[in-house]
């Protein structure tokens, strides 16, 4: 078993193992020396030869000091007692002096903190609540308090009037997950390692604001508006309650952008949680995603802000303001508003057409990185403050910790804003860092890094940029070439910041090594185009400047939007134009492949995903898409290889083992299906309803009905409306001979999912077997209504009409349709025999004989082929 270490212990060992001996480390942590040795092995912390030599020197010096101290103690024991008594008397005098006058001699920052805490009186800092709003995709210059006159945001404006508003707050990334990771760890993406949405995780060794507050006695909760911040990505660390609960089944397509909930659905569970917890001190985070596309605010905001697309964007922000007002009113009703810190901050903005970018994520201009930041503290002296100094969103966490009188961890890279809040303007010019790796990860173009202060903005790109943001706030005129000295200063500062802020020992996400045999097999199936990731090869080379590719980027986005709107022909035409201009854009290949999937052109889709992997063999999204396409095409060996590769690449993704379990279940290899489904559940228990349901189906095949029922009920606990669960419970009832209960379960499935054609079919067969032949007809009709190519459904409906001796001409048409759809399936002989019987009844003997012979011949053929 591994050594169990707390985060603080791990951090202490990492920071001190080179400078301190095992004895010193053990003494500090209060553990045995052997425990330290095992812990260092577990954390893979190894001292160099230099470290060991230095530790030996320290131990020698300490040994000499001990000997000298003993000699001195023997010689000067009386004198020592006399001196000690004087020291104690002086110390007591100093304590008395400090009690009355000490705050005037503290370091400046400590003075500010002490003054702030005095202003908060009679409230104690350690008893304040924190209500933390993150407003997704919200520009600072689209709020009333920031000078925008085309919108009404009275609640946010009032918070600014009663609090502190920062005019130059910069986000560290124009993407939701990296930005929120920075907000809640107080560190740069360079350090916490979350560089893009999806496929990145906030690692457990990173300390979050919620974790610190929970350790200090706060009840913690979070209420999330979009799947991009689902708990699976790691931001739930430290939260007692993390409300994500996204029902993925109700979305036609699942993407990080499309799975979202309206803000009213976010604050409703917050109100329920607060009703039970408002008498405790609490930290609650509310994430409002409404300002993100699509811009579709509810009434009256849709009508009030109907002036084009950007007007509807404002309408979404106005609606968010309304929701914030509802939350604040709830605090007042509970009489806790006066002891609650309110934070308003956006993760990033929205370009709205500036620099030819409509959304966000691609560029790092102020349109997407300059965000609102408002902090309202329960102090009248701090109302209405406006701070124009450059700050960063990573500064919020250390600021709150200082306000709450909690020590700030050493690895926090943000700076507390308490000094600025208390009026200190003597600090040196501050700089803010932003980055976007999105162009490189998705398109193979250059990443972007920027550095900003209150006067200039520098963007590191293949064609570097410098802007005078006072004279040119919309960054329209690049002054880089005419201001080389300023540009060089920013370049050096950016380089220094990136080197200093990067986490040591953490490499950027890259390919996982495979053995030679596995590599060759995967290459043969199209999963690997070469032995090195092209994204790795390109690092450091001159990649395309995103500025020069914005038109192609916009065409790709337009194709994605058309595809989402089921305008497949238009989407295909658009994305084909992009590929003709630049065949190496892996994301374009992905988009075209997904369009082919929707058109059921599986071979074309497979070819596209292979092309994407030729560009970047380690592009996980393309590997998944290729495996999924193989699965849809029933090329199961190829699909299995892909999903196994994905399990090696990302052991925390539950989708690959789920798909492997599904495939093996389809192949009736139940013993292989079960462990993969169990693995999927283990990885992501909160979203494991489908895996539990499939596991139930697997146990039905194994005749383990008790375990099957348990798994299906687990699925229903997680998702009460999950498809196929009641269908599977009906199968269990049938296996037990409980046919009446089986009918009830089938009917429940149909009530929840009227288009469930297999359930209609099974219920029809059950009615038939119970002698209720009339009842089977409507369900067989529903089965072929919802599944137009369901050959077996046509044949059994024809047989039902034959058995009832009615609609015989229609029965002929049904049988012929079933045979056309599947001329040589195991049920096809039945179709010919049905036709033979009908023709006999109609007196058409020759046709009857012909169909009978066809049925017998086909039956023999199928029998031989199965031997």
Residues of each region from the PLM?
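Short Lys/Arg-enriched helix C-cap and helix-to-coil transition segments
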Residues: 2-3, 45-67, 93-94
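Catalytic domains that recognize anionic headgroups
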Residues: 82, 88-594, 598-602, 607, ...
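Start-of-helix register in tetratricopeptide repeats
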Residues: 553, 587, 621, 655, ...
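TPR-repeat structural position
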Residues: 568, 602, 636, 670, ...
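Canonical positions in the second alpha-helix
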Residues: 578, 611-612, 645-646, 679-680, ...
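Register position in tetratricopeptide repeats
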Residues: 564, 598, 632-633, 666-667, ...
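Structural marker of alpha-solenoid helical repeat scaffolds
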Residues: 581, 615, 649, 683-684, ...
């Amino acid at each position: 078993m591994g050594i169990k270490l707390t985060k603080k212990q791990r951090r202490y060992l990492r920071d001190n193992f080179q400078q301190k001996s095992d004895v010193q480390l053990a003494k500090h942590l209060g553990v045995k020396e052997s425990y330290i040795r095992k812990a260092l092995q577990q954390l893979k912390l190894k001292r160099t030869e230099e470290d060991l030599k230095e530790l030996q020197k320290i131990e020698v010096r300490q040994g000499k000091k001990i000997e000298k101290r003993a000699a001195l103690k023997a010689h000067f024991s009386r004198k020592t007692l006399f001196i000690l008594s004087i020291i104690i008397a002086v110390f007591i005098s100093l304590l008395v002096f400090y009690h009355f006058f000490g705050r005037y001699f503290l370091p400046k920052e400590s003075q500010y903190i002490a003054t702030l805490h005095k202003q908060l009186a009679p409230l104690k800092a350690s008893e304040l609540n924190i209500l933390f709003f993150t407003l997704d995709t919200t520009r600072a210059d689209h709020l009333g308090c920031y000078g925008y006159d085309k919108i009404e945001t009275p609640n946010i404006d009032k918070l600014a009037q009663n609090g502190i508003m920062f005019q130059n707050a910069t986000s560290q990334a124009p993407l939701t997950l990296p930005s929120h990771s920075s907000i809640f760890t107080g560190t740069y993406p360079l350090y916490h390692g979350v560089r893009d949405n999806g496929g990145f995780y906030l690692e457990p060794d990173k300390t979050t604001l919620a974790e610190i507050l929970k350790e200090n006695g706060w009840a913690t909760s979070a209420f999330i508006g979009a799947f991009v911040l689902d708990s699976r990505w790691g931001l739930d660390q430290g939260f007692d309650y993390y409300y994500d609960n996204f029902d993925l089944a109700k979305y036609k397509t699942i993407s990080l952008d499309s799975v979202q909930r309206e803000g009213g659905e976010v604050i409703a569970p917050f109100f329920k949680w607060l009703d039970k917890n408002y008498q405790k001190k609490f930290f609650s985070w509310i994430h409002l995603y409404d300002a993100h596309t699509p811009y579709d605010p509810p009434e009256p905001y849709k009508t009030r802000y109907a002036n084009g697309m950007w007007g509807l964007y404002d309408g979404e922000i106005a609606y968010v303001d309304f929701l914030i007002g509802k939350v604040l009113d709830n605090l007042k009703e509970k009489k806790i508003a006066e002891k609650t810190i309110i934070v308003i901050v956006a993760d990033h903005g929205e370009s709205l057409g500036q620099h030819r970018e409509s959304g966000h994520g691609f560029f790092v201009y102020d349109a997407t990185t300059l965000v609102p930041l408002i902090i309202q503290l329960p102090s009248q002296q701090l109302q209405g403050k406006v701070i124009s100094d450059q700050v960063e969103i990573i500064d919020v966490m250390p600021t709150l910790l200082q306000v709450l009188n909690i020590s700030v961890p050493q690895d926090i890279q943000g700076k507390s804003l308490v000094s600025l809040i208390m009026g200190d303007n003597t600090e040196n010019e501050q700089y803010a860092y932003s980055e976007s790796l999105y162009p490189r990860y998705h398109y193979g173009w250059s990443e972007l890094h920027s550095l900003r202060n209150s006067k200039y903005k520098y963007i590191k790109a293949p064609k570097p940029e410098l802007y005078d943001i006072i004279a040119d706030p919309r960054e329209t005129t690049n002054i880089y070439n005419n201001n080389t000295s300023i540009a060089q200063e920013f370049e050096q500062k950016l380089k220094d910041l990136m080197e200093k802020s990067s986490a040591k020992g953490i490499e950027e996400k890259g390919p996982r090594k495979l053995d030679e045999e596995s590599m060759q097999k995967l290459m043969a199936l199209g999963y690997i185009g070469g032995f090195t990731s092209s994204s790795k090869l390109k690092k450091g080379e001159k990649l395309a400047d995103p500025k020069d590719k914005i038109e192609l980027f916009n065409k790709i986005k337009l194709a994605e939007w058309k595809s989402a709107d089921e305008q497949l022909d238009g989407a295909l035409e658009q994305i084909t134009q992009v590929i003709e201009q630049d065949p190496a854009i892996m994301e374009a290949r992905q988009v075209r492949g997904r369009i082919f999937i929707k058109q059921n052109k599986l071979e074309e889709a497979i070819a596209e995903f292979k092309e994407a992997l030729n560009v970047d063999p380690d592009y996980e999204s393309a590997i998944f898409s290729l495996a999924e396409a193989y699965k849809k095409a029933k090329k199961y060996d190829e699909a299995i290889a892909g999903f196994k590769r994905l399990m090696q690449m990302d052991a925390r993704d539950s989708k690959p083992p789920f798909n492997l379990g599904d495939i093996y279940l389809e192949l009736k290899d139940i013993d292989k299906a079960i462990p993969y489904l169990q693995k999927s559940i283990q990885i992501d228990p909160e979203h494991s309803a489908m895996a539990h349901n499939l596991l139930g189906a697997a146990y039905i095949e194994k005749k383990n009905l008790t375990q099957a029922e348990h798994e299906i009920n687990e699925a229903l606990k997680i998702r009460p409306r999950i498809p196929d669960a009641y269908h599977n419970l009906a199968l269990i009832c049938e296996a037990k001979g409980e046919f009446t209960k089986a009918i009830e379960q089938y009917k429940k499935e149909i009530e929840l999912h009227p288009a469930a054609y297999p359930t209609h079919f099974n219920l029809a067969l059950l009615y038939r077997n119970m002698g209720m032949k009339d009842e089977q007809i409507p369900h067989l009709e529903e089965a072929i209504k919802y599944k137009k190519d369901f050959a077996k459904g046509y044949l059994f409906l024809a047989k039902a009409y034959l058995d009832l001796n009615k609609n015989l001409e229609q029965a002929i048409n049904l049988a012929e349709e079933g045979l056309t759809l599947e001329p040589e399936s195991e049920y096809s002989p039945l179709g010919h025999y049905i036709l033979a019987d009908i023709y006999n009844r109609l007196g058409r003997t020759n046709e009857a004989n012909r169909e009978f012979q066809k049925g017998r011949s086909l039956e023999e053929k199928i029998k031989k082929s199965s031997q």
